[in-house]
């Protein structure tokens, strides 16, 4: 290209020349930069303050625009520093997803037991993210500065339909899919907009299947001394589902077609830390094929990520109809919306279907019983 020789020389100077040369280039780069990227926490660091002073000196200037993404996951303190650095602030987030991560349920319970009710109520208020407070306040005071995006491009429409009802209040026409039907179902895996997976397991998955609920009706259990939950029936079901996927016609072809490591990974998500620990143990011990790339985590830590294939372990199942963490629609929304091509949810279908939010999601899925699947993969 026109500038290839200059760029190549610049790269050589940066990597080969002495320290003084590299520092010279860095100073020249800083003085001409027009875009600075940083996390919220880095914005308060000495490193970024030095860059700020280099750009603006001691003048009380500010960045023309500060754009803050994933703002619903930021605490008020994390949001405050970047917000004072800009003449114009654009805050982007989704208050239908999870707020800043903290184990507030355990903290609140402990404080109430210690008769610290006022402090417990204060911490409970953090369940509503600062982004949601700003969004709702701005909408009341000056609606013109608030905009709502209504179109998603991540997932196949059939997966989107499992979460669309979470946005029905804000979006008059509901959540829209920005992918054309002919693009979504394009059998060329890497074609623009393709969400085709091509997997076939007769009686379980076809290429046109994108959202499945696998019914497992075993009850949860609580490890001694823990506030978390495990469901051993679902642990067995995860192993069965993965074996089924590996045996599926088209699975290896699909995996070979994916170039990025993260696109080959199967995401395994659960709502509970104890279940996450057990799944990690299974993978480490080889009970889940270690040659299969997997990304395993709790739903809170999966926010912001996506994978082609997602398996979710819901965990909760009891006679008392207690859903715990799993009842939070933000947690459901984040979990289900991580999948691009195939979503498989494992859980007690009858138990969760009694919850109105889950019922709407489940009704948009194909249904299969784990016993049927176990028979297929023998």
Give the predicted meaning of each segment.
Residues 1-64:
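Conserved helicase NTPase catalytic core signature
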Residues 41-43, 51-378:
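Conserved helicase motor core of SF1/SF2 NTP-dependent helicases
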